[in-house]
């Protein structure tokens, strides 16, 4: 509140609160209006202190008055409020806002200023007629006149409020979208830097974006100063100086100087245009940041409508900062490339460079029927989440009765208080001073002696946090002593003396009381025998008691203690007895006017009080974690455990609590997760496991910081190596305190002899999804700092495993490793001695490491009589792991054994090929293999070898020694080419080399240069591969056929085709040659694609060594031009074998049904009896329909079942429909109740038109006069026929009339008018006016009267033209929207009723009823419920449905904690 509330004194505030907002209203001004005004000042670059004086208010009025006529409601309210404040400061008696505004207009001479402005405008307009030079208009034709020439002088004309208002509206609506840059260019054309700064200053709510623009301005200004250094020496008298960067930005230059630089300087420097370019650069950067999605990332979803994808694509294109040529290339290549597979198949069939209209037309059905189901599913999900939020909001406790802040009585608010206004402190609540002068704060005190001697300081200790959550502050629970490193017991602090009542004191035995923090830690202490209720404050240095609670005798010294709120005079009594629990201590007591009694550290420290937390380093940063949006924590019951496991869990938890890694909690935490334990590998110890599956579902998603395991072949060769392991890695990193409550778990008691012991984690727990990522990130940041200090060491980290190498001798290396361990220990990361490996071989991540070589840990293949799917999976996994060092391993036939099998325990029958492959692999593994380390600067060579069965093997070598090996299998394609597989293998090699060594290898491939280049010349676009060296290795044999690019002369041409009847599955295939040779065969149980391929096979069989083949099948063309060498299709294999035998083959595709000679003849031969044409008889009817209604081709195609090309041809033959092409119909995103209305003129008559924005449905008629009465009648007609909730019109007098306003009030219609400088405001109605006139022009000859033509045109537009969303007519679309809305409302009602029920359910054979869950759906035999974030299905017999009548309260709600409601609790 600050200065805003101090703008008026008490007397002025009383007068201010008696002024009414409106002359006839009851509401009056309140303090909240002053607070709001203070915050609004920042938007206009004004200080809120200006509200405190009459002169300040006058300055504010001068700024706001030009903007008030066209300003927003908020700006007008601020202007009115400042006028009222001006009158209050001036002691003018006013009753309401209107009187204040009238007084301000007279006092500030605003009326005279308006008259002078009108007079100047009149003189300027008359001067323009007389003076040819007149006003300098910017070249873009903008009406923002920056200056006017009067004689030889230039006078600045500021921007109009309308221009500023349009700029503010544009920014508020577009939010720095791609449209904001052209909008700024249009509005700022010809402006001076002063005008541009004024445009930036009105954007008060976008400080982040303005800061980006400011940084760009500073950079460009610095570049300008470097490129234009100032001249040496002083300037001659009268010469205008050159502008600097700050001058161009308008910070160090006046408006007159800017005008002189622009218009009169020699040479002229257009500082306004230069500054505009700088601002545009900044705005473009803002647009990029506010629209972070790149056009490369715009991809069509599987069920997304193609039109929606196009809209997103072009929106991203507009935000891209690229040239027009680049954007054109992006549109042509990416729009089709990033479409979903369904649309991509359709778009590729359109040929090269299809138009956008053709693409939208072809793909308009994608996402249609299923899109509605998707919307309904999302709505259902939203309703569920809203219902959960509403139910959650009802769990809070009831609000207390209202209390007056002025008099302190209950039952009324401050604004209703009849007593005089009291000036009261907002912090302590006492009268007589303001909050800024308050001295009664409880803060971190520090002693300031009166005599000015040196300040006393108390010793500082580590702050730790231990277990809390006892049910009462008076309950005492013994706890083990904190670690000795934290605080030494019995150590006194600054003159305090400690005395124990007995040797059996709990504090002397190393046990102290624990206090919960769910309420204030207040205890009863005895000071000189007087019981005092005091707050135990570890943050306060001193003990201070209220004068009313304690009166001490004896000598005292005056002191001043300082806090944030100021100094406080106290009395200091030294050496006073204080008894806290069983401890009797002597120390210093301060007596003063404190709001609450405080026991500080001078008493708590000698008493042995400590804040105990786990052994988690306070230096380690805490990573904030939260739940997913709308998710809640786990509420799972603990399942039964055996006595042995309960005892083991209790021992583990006692140790973890002693180390501070977990903390005890009480029943106020409502969350719980089941816990259990298992025996470790050595069977001597237990391991605690917590089932965090439910919490993992609700926790936010994380990204794995480390994406793979470091490979030993990528390590450099080191003379010394050490392998470390961080013990209890997760337990070393603290967990976000706000998230700890969700990790709560319970250890039950045997036979339920007592309540279970509850804990929560203070560190990262095992099994939680966030632990790996947080640990990786935290450990990496710690090691980064250590690496800078221990530069001789090379440290490689993967999770908690560390590989440390160096080139030092053994002694130095061990010393550096010990330093590393000490530094890790200082951060709280321990490295146990038993996990430190100092001698080779080192076991690390499944490898065996030596300083000069590495191996894979021994792998043994089992011999079993019976193998299951799970056994085969484990076997293949072992072989894949071994393949990185053992060359020649194969798994293709082993994988075939489990293809299609899903049950892991299903028995597998071995094939002969798999047994041979298994035996070969066993022989390979018998020979021990080893790899070497990487030598920087030496080239890496990759040798590729082809194995049997389409499998490949490769080796990475360096100086003849093997770094690593691997294997590769062909992709899962039906038709493959080994050269394409080889290209994929090379890509894999290069990617693997870049990941491990960061460089590309020299490739040795089994292929000849000429053979590869012959294939690569035509198929280079299939993938990217690097350059390689062709070496003398066994070449890949050429087993593919040759396709020529030009027809083979003097050879016969075979036109092939095939056809199939879809019902009978019978077909024909054949060919016809240019010399008349032909052959046609009948086929059974075939398809169109198979028939096309069979025709090609027949042509190959009957032709010579050279052949020309022409087909109209893109399917066959696509397969054969890829030159496959093997295929899973027998027919393709036969065609490949025939083509390999040919010397030359020319294969060409032509479009079908285009009248091409041989193709048309063979098509007739194979189509006879197969294909039928059913639409010919409908063409004549369609032509008659179009001559009457002139409907578009979509309507003709749907109504009469015509192909699109036939329907388009009918429209093209009509002379009246060839004025312009067919428009692409698109609809804006609007609700079903939004209409736009406008008046247009035709043949001297007024036509009023209304359009339903979402559907394009129009209502129109001729009205006698353009008046409010006629407009209201027409509006009533629409209201009586269609649902209308919002009406948008322009600012015409008939639309803003009282008749229309009354009709909108009666019909509950929201009426909005057009926005200046916003071309989209009335876009729908303007487009419909144009279309309506075009239709009328086509049918005007058929009717006598204009009124008839208008109604006929409405009928044609609404019922005879299809397009837009769903390919429907506007009438169909409107009815569909209304029906859909009714269905959704009905569905919402059903969902709401269902969600009011709760379900208790049983799972499997578990007799315990669980729940309650939320009922989502109920059928005859099953129900679907929601438990947590999962949807589950249960049989009806295992579910009980009840109605939830009353919301339940949980102890974990924050509203149940004392102190959560404020200081009064």
UniProtKB/Swiss-Prot annotation:
The p66 RT is structured in five subdomains: finger, palm, thumb, connection and RNase H. Within the palm subdomain, the 'primer grip' region is thought to be involved in the positioning of the primer terminus for accommodating the incoming nucleotide. The RNase H domain stabilizes the association of RT with primer-template. Binds 2 magnesium ions for reverse transcriptase polymerase activity. Binds 2 magnesium ions for ribonuclease H (RNase H) activity. Substrate-binding is a precondition for magnesium binding. This is Gag-Pol polyprotein. Its cofactor is Mg(2+). It holds the Pfam family Gag_p24. The reverse transcriptase is an error-prone enzyme that lacks a proof-reading function. High mutations rate is a direct consequence of this characteristic. RT also displays frequent template switching leading to high recombination rate. Recombination mostly occurs between homologous regions of the two copackaged RNA genomes. If these two RNA molecules derive from different viral strains, reverse transcription will give rise to highly recombinated proviral DNAs. Residues 1228-1378 form the Integrase catalytic domain. A zinc finger (CCHC-type) spans 402-419, 423-440. Mg(2+) 2 binds at residues 1057, 1092, 1112, 1163. It catalyses: Specific for a P1 residue that is hydrophobic, and P1' variable, but often Pro; Endohydrolysis of RNA in RNA/DNA hybrids. Three different cleavage modes: 1. sequence-specific internal cleavage of RNA. Human immunodeficiency virus type 1 and Moloney murine leukemia virus enzymes prefer to cleave the RNA strand one nucleotide away from the RNA-DNA junction. 2. RNA 5'-end directed cleavage 13-19 nucleotides from the RNA end. 3. DNA 3'-end directed cleavage 15-20 nucleotides away from the primer terminus; 3'-end directed exonucleolytic cleavage of viral RNA-DNA hybrid; DNA(n) + a 2'-deoxyribonucleoside 5'-triphosphate = DNA(n+1) + diphosphate. It comes from Simian immunodeficiency virus agm.vervet (isolate AGM3) (SIV-agm.ver). The viral protease is inhibited by many synthetic protease inhibitors (PIs), such as amprenavir, atazanavir, indinavir, loprinavir, nelfinavir, ritonavir and saquinavir. RT can be inhibited either by nucleoside RT inhibitors (NRTIs) or by non nucleoside RT inhibitors (NNRTIs). NRTIs act as chain terminators, whereas NNRTIs inhibit DNA polymerization by binding a small hydrophobic pocket near the RT active site and inducing an allosteric change in this region. The record marks 145-146, 376-377, 443-444, 512-513, 613-614, 1054-1055, 1174-1175 as: Cleavage.
């Amino acid at each position: 509140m600050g200065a805003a509330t101090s703008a008026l004194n008490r007397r002025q505030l009383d007068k201010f609160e008696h002024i009414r907002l409106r002359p006839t209203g009851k509401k009056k001004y309140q303090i909240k209006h002053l607070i709001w005004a203070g915050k609004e000042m920042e938007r206009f670059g004004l200080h809120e202190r200006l509200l405190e004086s009459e002169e300040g208010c006058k300055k504010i009025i001068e700024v706001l008055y030009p903007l008030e006529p066209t300003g927003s409601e908020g700006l007008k309210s601020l202007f009115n409020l400042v006028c009222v404040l001006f009158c209050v400061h001036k002691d003018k008696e006013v009753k309401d806002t209107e009187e204040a505004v009238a007084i301000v207009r007279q006092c500030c001479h605003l009326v005279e200023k308006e008259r002078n402005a009108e007079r100047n405008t009149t003189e300027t307009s008359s001067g323009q007629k007389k003076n040819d030079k007149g006003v300098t208009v910017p070249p873009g034709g903008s009406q923002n006149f920056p200056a006017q020439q009067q004689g030889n002088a230039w006078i600045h004309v500021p921007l109009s409020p309308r221009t500023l208002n349009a700029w503010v509206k544009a920014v508020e609506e577009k939010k720095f979208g791609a449209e904001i840059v052209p909008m700024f260019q249009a509005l700022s054309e010809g402006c001076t830097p002063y005008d541009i700064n004024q445009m930036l200053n009105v954007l008060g709510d976008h400080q982040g974006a303005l800061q980006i623009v400011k940084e760009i301005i500073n950079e460009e200004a610095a570049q300008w100063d470097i490129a234009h250094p100032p001249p040496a020496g002083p300037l001659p008298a009268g010469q205008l100086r050159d502008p600097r960067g700050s001058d161009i930005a308008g910070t160090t230059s006046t408006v007159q100087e800017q005008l002189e630089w622009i218009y009169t300087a020699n040479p002229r420097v257009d500082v306004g245009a230069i500054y505009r370019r700088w601002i545009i650069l900044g705005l473009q950067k803002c647009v990029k940041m506010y629209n972070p999605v790149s056009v490369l990332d715009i991809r069509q979803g599987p069920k997304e409508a193609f039109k929606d994808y196009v809209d997103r694509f072009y929106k991203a294109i507009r935000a891209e900062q690229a040239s027009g040529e680049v954007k054109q290339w992006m549109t042509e290549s990416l729009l089709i490339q990033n479409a979903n597979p369904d649309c991509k198949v359709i778009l590729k069939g359109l040929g090269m460079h299809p138009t956008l209209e053709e693409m939208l037309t072809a793909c308009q059905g994608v996402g249609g029927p299923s899109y509605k189901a998707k919307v309904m599913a999302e709505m259902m999900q939203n309703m569920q989440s809203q219902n959960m939020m509403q139910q959650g909001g009802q769990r809070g406790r009831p609000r207390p009765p209202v209390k007056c802040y002025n008099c302190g009585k209950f039952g009324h608010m401050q604004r209703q208080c009849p007593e005089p206004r009291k000036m009261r402190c907002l912090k302590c609540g006492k009268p007589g001073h303001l909050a800024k002068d308050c001295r009664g704060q409880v803060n971190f005190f520090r002693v300031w002696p009166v005599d000015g001697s040196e300040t006393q300081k108390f010793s500082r200790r580590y702050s730790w946090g231990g277990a809390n959550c006892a049910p009462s502050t008076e309950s005492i629970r013994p706890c083990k002593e904190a670690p000795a490193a934290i605080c030494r017991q019995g150590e006194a602090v600054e003159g305090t003396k400690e005395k124990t009542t007995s040797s059996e004191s709990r504090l002397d035995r190393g046990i102290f009381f624990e206090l919960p923090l769910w309420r204030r830690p207040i205890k009863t202490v005895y000071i000189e025998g007087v019981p005092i209720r005091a707050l135990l404050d570890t943050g306060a240095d001193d003990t201070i008691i209220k004068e009313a609670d304690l009166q001490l005798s004896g000598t005292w010294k005056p002191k001043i203690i300082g806090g944030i709120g100021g100094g406080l005079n106290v009395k200091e009594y030294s050496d006073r007895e204080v008894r806290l629990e069983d401890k009797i201590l002597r120390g210093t007591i301060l007596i003063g006017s404190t709001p609450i009694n405080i026991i500080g550290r001078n008493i708590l420290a000698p008493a042995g009080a400590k804040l105990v937390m786990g052994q988690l380093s306070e230096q380690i940063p805490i990573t904030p974690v939260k739940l997913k949006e709308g998710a809640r924590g786990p509420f799972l019951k603990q399942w039964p455990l055996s006595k042995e496991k309960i005892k083991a869990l209790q021992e583990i938890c006692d140790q973890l609590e002693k180390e501070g890694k977990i903390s005890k909690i009480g029943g106020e935490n409502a969350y719980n997760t089941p816990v259990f334990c298992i025996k470790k590998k050595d069977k001597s110890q237990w391991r605690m496991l917590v089932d965090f599956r439910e919490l993992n579902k609700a926790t936010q998603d994380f990204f794995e910081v480390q994406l793979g395991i470091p490979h030993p072949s990528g390590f450099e060769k080191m003379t010394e190596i050490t392998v470390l392991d961080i013990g209890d890695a997760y337990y070393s990193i603290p967990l976000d305190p706000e998230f700890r409550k969700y990790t709560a778990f319970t250890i039950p008691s045997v036979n339920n002899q007592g309540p279970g012991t509850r804990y929560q984690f203070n560190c990262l727990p095992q099994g939680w999804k966030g632990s790996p990522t947080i640990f990786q990130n935290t450990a990496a940041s710690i090691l980064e700092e250590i690496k800078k200090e221990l530069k001789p060491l090379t440290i490689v980290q993967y999770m908690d495993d560390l590989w440390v190498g160096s080139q030092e001798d053994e002694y130095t290396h061990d010393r550096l490793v010990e330093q590393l361990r000490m530094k890790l220990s200082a951060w709280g990361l321990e490295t146990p001695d038993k996990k430190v490996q100092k001698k080779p071989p080192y076991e690390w991540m499944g490898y065996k490491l030596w300083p000069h070589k590495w191996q894979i840990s021994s792998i043994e293949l089992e011999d079993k009589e019976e193998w299951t799917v799970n056994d085969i999976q484990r076997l293949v996994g072992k072989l894949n792991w071994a393949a990185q060092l053992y060359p020649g391993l194969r798994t293709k036939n082993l994988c075939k054994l489990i293809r299609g099998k899903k049950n892991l325990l299903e028995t597998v029958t071995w094939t002969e090929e798999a047994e041979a492959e298994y035996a070969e692999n066993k022989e390979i593994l018998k020979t021990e293999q080893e790899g070497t380390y990487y030598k920087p600067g030496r080239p890496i060579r990759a040798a590729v070898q082809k194995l049997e069965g389409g499998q490949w093997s490769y080796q990475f070598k360096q100086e003849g020694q093997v770094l690593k090996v691997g294997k590769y299998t062909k992709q899962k394609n039906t038709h493959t080419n080994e050269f394409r597989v080889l290209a994929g293998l090379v890509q894999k090699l290069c990617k693997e080399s870049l990941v491990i060594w960061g460089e590309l290898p020299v490739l040795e491939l089994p292929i000849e240069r000429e053979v590869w280049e012959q294939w690569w010349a035509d198929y280079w676009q299939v993938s990217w591969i690097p350059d390689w060296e062709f070496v003398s290795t066994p070449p890949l044999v050429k087993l593919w056929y040759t396709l020529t690019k030009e027809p083979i002369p003097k050879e016969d041409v075979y036109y092939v085709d095939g056809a199939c009847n879809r019902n009978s599955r019978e077909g024909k295939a054949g060919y016809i040659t240019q010399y008349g040779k032909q052959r046609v065969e009948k086929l059974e149980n075939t398809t169109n694609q198979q028939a096309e391929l069979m025709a090609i096979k027949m042509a190959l069989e009957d032709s010579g060594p050279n052949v020309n083949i022409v087909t109209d099948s893109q399917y066959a063309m696509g397969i054969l031009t890829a030159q496959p060498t093997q295929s899973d299709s027998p027919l393709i294999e036969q065609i490949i074998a025939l083509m390999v035998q040919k010397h030359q083959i020319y294969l060409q595709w032509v479009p079908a049904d285009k009248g091409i000679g041989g193709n048309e003849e063979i098509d007739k031969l194979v189509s006879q009896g197969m294909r039928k044409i059913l639409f010919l008889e409908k063409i004549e009817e369609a032509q008659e329909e179009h001559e009457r209604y002139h409907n578009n081709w979509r309507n003709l195609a749907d109504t009469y079942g015509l192909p699109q090309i036939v329907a388009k041809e009918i429209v093209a033959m009509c002379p009246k429909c060839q004025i312009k092409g067919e428009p692409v119909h698109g609809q804006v995103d609007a609700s079903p109740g939004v209409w736009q209305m406008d008046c247009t003129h035709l043949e001297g008559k007024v036509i009023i038109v209304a359009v339903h924005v979402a559907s394009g449905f129009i209502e129109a008629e001729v009205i006698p006069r353009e008046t409010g009465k006629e407009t209201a009648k027409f509006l009533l007609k629409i209201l009586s026929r269609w649902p209308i909730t919002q009406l948008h019109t322009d600012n015409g007098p008939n639309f803003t009339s009282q008749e229309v306003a009354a009709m909108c009030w009666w019909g509950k219609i929201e009426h909005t008018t057009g926005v200046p400088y916003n071309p989209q405001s009335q876009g729908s109605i303007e487009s419909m006016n144009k279309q309506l006139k075009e239709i009328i022009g086509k049918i005007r000859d058929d009717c006598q009267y204009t009124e008839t033509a208008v109604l006929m045109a409405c009928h044609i537009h609404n019922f005879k033209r299809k397009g837009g969303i769903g390919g429907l007519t506007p009438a169909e679309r409107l009815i569909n929207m209304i029906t859909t809305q009714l269905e959704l409302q009905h569905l919402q009602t059903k969902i709401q009723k269902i969600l009011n029920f709760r379900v208790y359910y049983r799972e499997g054979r578990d007799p315990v009823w669980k729940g309650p869950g939320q009922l989502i759906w109920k059928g005859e035999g099953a129900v679907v419920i929601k438990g947590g974030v999962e949807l589950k299905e249960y049989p009806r017999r295992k579910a009980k449905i009840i109605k939830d009548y009353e919301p339940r309260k949980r102890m974990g709600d924050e509203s149940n904690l004392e102190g959560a409601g404020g200081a009064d609790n």
